[in-house]
């Protein structure tokens, strides 16, 4: 078992990483202040892991809230059903919410915790690779709006993050690949040696070899903890964590939430960020191609949806949290391992990026 710390002063909290942590009370008890707990999960995860978690909560009064599964349900009506359950069972300010599931559950349970009686404690128990390495750490919570992803929410930190790597054994291959998009991101934005490590261990990660998986999760969480500790509310360096996300969120919104998994959209969006960085002269063709090959080896799409036009992208990218004073800012790379957030680029470079033939680009790289 490994422990990391997100250093935010009095709001600091631990990240526990290990196998079979879910049923062990020692990882939960120090972070629960009252006797009332509400576990928020979904119809896919609850049958697999809820009873195990309840074993760690023995002796407490537990409300179970099981929601529909999927990005399409990350919206106001579902959030309201969490509040309904809390109020019906008379939960008070000493209640602790526990988010048992992937990124959708973590985001919604965290937002519910931020809002309920103006704030109650919550614990993240992420069960997908994507949520383990990204969304469970850092306090971003919220829901989607039909016009834009994650546009309604709050920064609200958990009391702890409990990562049980055993939960990945039931994760579909497509979800595993989606999570690897966020793992790869950390190498691209701030840790070039991690890219080399991922190239050497990608087969082991796809096979869920425990040592490789634990190492990838720990390095990813450590990178995110450093960034969040330096910039909790995304006023500066934290925005670099959104590499590929502006393009990716446009894909998710245009295609319909849940049609593309978040990590899949980020994968294709990262290819677009690599291409734009290359067009600006910040990334060599060899570096761009190296990045695309790694994403493809992870089983991720490296071509945006064929039915999305440049105009579609621009329409959806205009509704993005990184737009300031009407100016679109993007996360781009000035070399692998060095991300920047900038709105200082020629419009024609962005337009050319959106009109690139990514199918031809992928085909010219050949098969692995």
From Swiss-Prot:
Location in or out of the cell: Cytoplasm
Enzyme class: lyase
Pathway note: Metabolic intermediate biosynthesis; chorismate biosynthesis; chorismate from D-erythrose 4-phosphate and phosphoenolpyruvate: step 2/7
EC number: 4.2.3.4
Catalysed reactions, as listed in the record: 7-phospho-2-dehydro-3-deoxy-D-arabino-heptonate = 3-dehydroquinate + phosphate
GO annotations of cellular component type: cytoplasm
Names of required cofactors: Co(2+); Zn(2+); NAD(+)
Stated name of the protein: 3-dehydroquinate synthase
Annotated organism of origin: Pseudomonas paraeruginosa (strain DSM 24068 / PA7) (Pseudomonas aeruginosa (strain PA7))
Gene expressing this chain: aroB
């Amino acid at each position: 078992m490994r422990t990391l710390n997100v250093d935010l002063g009095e709001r600091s909290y631990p990240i526990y990483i290990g196998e079979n942590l879910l049923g062990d009370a020692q990882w939960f008890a120090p972070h629960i202040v009252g006797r009332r707990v509400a576990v928020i999960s979904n119809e896919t995860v609850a049958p697999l892991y809820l009873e195990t978690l309840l074993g760690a909560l023995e002796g407490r009064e537990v409300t179970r809230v099981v929601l529909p599964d999927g990005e399409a349900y990350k919206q106001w009506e579902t959030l309201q059903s969490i509040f309904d359950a809390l109020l019906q069972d008379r939960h008070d300010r000493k209640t602790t919410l526990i988010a048992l599931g992937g990124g959708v559950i973590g985001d919604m349970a965290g937002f519910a915790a931020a809002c309920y009686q103006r704030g109650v404690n919550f614990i993240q128990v992420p069960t997908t690779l994507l949520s383990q390495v990204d969304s469970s750490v850092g306090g971003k919570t919220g829901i989607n709006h039909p016009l834009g992803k994650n546009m309604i929410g709050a920064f609200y930190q958990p009391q702890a993050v409990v990562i049980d790597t055993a939960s990945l054994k039931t994760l579909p291959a497509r979800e595993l690949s989606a999570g690897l998009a966020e793992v790869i991101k950390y190498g691209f934005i701030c840790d070039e040696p991690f890219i080399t490590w991922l190239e050497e261990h990608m087969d082991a990660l796809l096979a869920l070899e425990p040592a490789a998986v634990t190492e990838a999760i720990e390095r990813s969480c450590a990178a995110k903890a450093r960034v969040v500790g330096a910039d909790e509310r995304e006023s500066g360096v934290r925005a670099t964590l959104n590499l590929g996300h502006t393009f990716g969120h446009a894909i998710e919104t245009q295609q319909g939430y849940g049609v593309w998994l978040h990590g899949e959209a980020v994968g294709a969006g990262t290819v677009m960020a690599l291409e734009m960085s290359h067009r600006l002269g910040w990334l060599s063709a060899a570096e761009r191609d190296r990045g695309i090959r790694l994403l493809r080896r992870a089983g991720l799409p490296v071509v945006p949806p064929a039915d999305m036009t440049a105009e579609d992208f621009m329409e959806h990218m205009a509704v993005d949290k990184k737009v300031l004073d009407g100016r679109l800012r993007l996360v781009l790379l000035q070399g692998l391992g060095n991300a920047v957030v900038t709105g200082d680029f020629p419009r024609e470079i962005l337009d050319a990026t959106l009109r690139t033939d990514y199918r031809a680009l992928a085909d010219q790289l050949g098969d692995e």
